[in-house]
Regions:
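N-terminal acidic leader/helix
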Residues: 2-42, 46-49
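Repeat-associated, polar segments at repeat-unit boundaries in modular proteins
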Residues: 68-69
């Protein structure tokens, strides 16, 4: 497995889990420790926006992302 494939696998497993602890561990592993410490609203907005940008994201996870972003006043990336 290449480094890119490993990164994508880790990213998808973390983000699609919607488990904050798992996502925080992924962020710290890849040098985004500050994002892991973000307040809830900013953290989840970042997570859901990132999910919207992933080709092949599971439909149910993508729908949760769209719903959360809409309910919290954020735009949905196209």
């Amino acid at each position: 497995m290449t480094m890119i494939e490993s990164f994508v696998k880790d990213r998808n497993e973390a983000l699609f889990s919607l488990d904050r602890r798992k996502i925080e561990a992924y962020l710290v592993k890849y040098g985004e420790g500050e994002t892991a410490k973000a307040p809830d609203m900013l953290f989840w907005a970042s997570v859901y926006k990132a999910i919207c940008g992933i080709n092949g994201a599971p439909k149910d996870v993508l729908e949760k992302a769209h719903t959360w972003l809409s309910r919290n006043g954020f735009s949905i990336p196209s």
